[in-house]
Amino acid sequence: MSLTKKASEPKLSGTSIKPTTLNPHAAEFVPFTLRSPSSGGTSTLDTRLLASSSSVGKAVLDRTESSASHHSDEEARQFWSHQLPDDITPDFGLMTQDDNSYGSGSLSLANLSLFDGNEAEKFPSASGGYGFSDQTGLASHNANGNSLADKSRYPISSFGEDPQRQSFMQLSPKPWDKQIMNAEQLLGNDRERNPFSGKSRHGFVNDMITESPGDMEVNPVDFLASQFPGFAAESLAEVYFANGCDLQLTIEMLTQLELQVDGGLNQNISPKTYAPPSLTPMDFPALSISNSHGIPAQFGGDDLQQTGNHYQSPEKDNMFFFKSGPSVSQPGAIDYVSAVRKLASQDSGMWKYERNDSADSSIGSSRNSGAYKSGRGRSIYSDKLQSRAQTRPAPVWVETGDAVGNMYSELREEARDYARLRNVYFEQARQAYLVGNKALAKELSVKGQLHNMQMKAAHGKAQEAIYRQRNPVGQGNSRGNERMIDLHGLHVSEALQVLKHELSVLRSTARATQERLQIYICVGTGHHTRGSRTPARLPVAVQRYLLEEEGLDYSEPQAGLLRVIIY
């Protein structure tokens, strides 16, 4: 193979030299390797021989066209037909045609393997395709049919068997023209090829939506109607436009609605009977709503049976419709878009009770006329309330806000009166001292100090009254190993003194019983100091005291409530 390569190189290099310097006998010199080809060569060897012969033939063609050679194309073809084997005889007609459209180095066969499955990709075509699909007339120039076109037919014929390769090999000059498919054809082909893949319809829809948006050319409303036959086309269109023409979001909402409707039907079909709820009319106060004419209407729980007709359409019995919370629809008019928008803010797994102007807010997000007529909705709600009351212990209620403010004002009123008198006496004493009446200034200062002592005594009594009222002796806010220390209404110095005393008592109790005690300390969030120049000082002071003085780590399960563990 090295000899072949070396033999072809001088001939190729000769084409770049001027015709006047060429050896006139160089065209008649043929290497010995080309006269007697090796019989045991592989496909790679044949390929390289083909490349060498093609380059030599090209050189001969160039010389026939120049003034240095007197051979015609026919003489060159006859010459090489006698000198080269039949299977590597070059086709001068094809190469002449290629010379008109490509340069001398555009067609390279050096790295070509005749038995490579991807060989057709190495031949660029001017028509936009790949391979010699438009030039199959190569075989007509050879008698035995063992030409290059015959060998290149294998990958071309295999394109029909491999759809992926065929689609790649038959690319058009404008590939974006064929990007849009028919969604119905795509759905039909997938269903015929894979009738059941173990996925639900909604999973298949999600797979379809995750594809490129340009691959579908179908009306979104028609697509939704085909996937959700239980809903009206008008309602689907309203939901689709209400979601900003987001098809994925619309399908997710419709899927949740369909699942909720199926769950409601299963509850109605089940033969389980519910006990009548033990509720009084006070549990269901009359709610005020506005009808279609804007006139307020009053109705209680017994009128729910009459409103059940608004959840069904008189024309289409097989459709499922929902009504929005704050409005009551007339027969046949469905506020479906509001129901879908409300779905995002509702929890389908929990039953909610809202005290607002909604006519149907006492039941959860999934309801129908059957549940209202049979009274099962209220029964389910009452059963859930009873079960929660039995399983959960009674919470510890701590009054805050106005209750604390009123108590503070009432019990601290006497101390504030003494404080005002003290300030008046101190101001008069200062004025008397400034004018030089020191005796009067001293007398007024003594009266001010007396009122200051009375103020402190009043604050002490108010502190004890406030703490005992917020933390009674037989306090109901202590259960098990949990204790509650409520410091609402106390000043910082008073709260720290009380906290130090209570923690010492609880620590002694924990050591005596050898148990861990969980202490909750209620310090508030500073609502009473809101609007003043100074922020709330009690929470910061208590936190610093626990860390620095007591050495206790605390956590804050909610704002204004600290939790420590003593053992």
UniProtKB/Swiss-Prot annotation:
Gene3D superfamilies the record matches: 3.30.1370.110
PAM2-like (motif): residue ranges: 21-31
Domain Smr: 485-567
Stretches for region Disordered: 1-22, 355-387
CDD domains named in the record: CUE_CID7_like (cd14371)
SMART domains (UniProt xref): DUF1771, SMR
Biased composition (Polar residues): 13-22, 359-371
Summary of the tissues where the protein is detected: Expressed in cauline leaves, stems, rosette leaves, immature siliques and primary inflorescences.
GO terms of molecular function: mRNA binding
Organism: Arabidopsis thaliana (Mouse-ear cress)
CUE domain span: 215-259
Known partners and oligomeric status: Interacts with MPC and PAB2.
Listed name of the protein: Polyadenylate-binding protein-interacting protein 7
Pfam families given in the database record: DUF1771
Annotated domain remarks: Contains a PAM2-like motif, which seems to be involved in the binding to the PABC/CTC domain of PAB proteins.
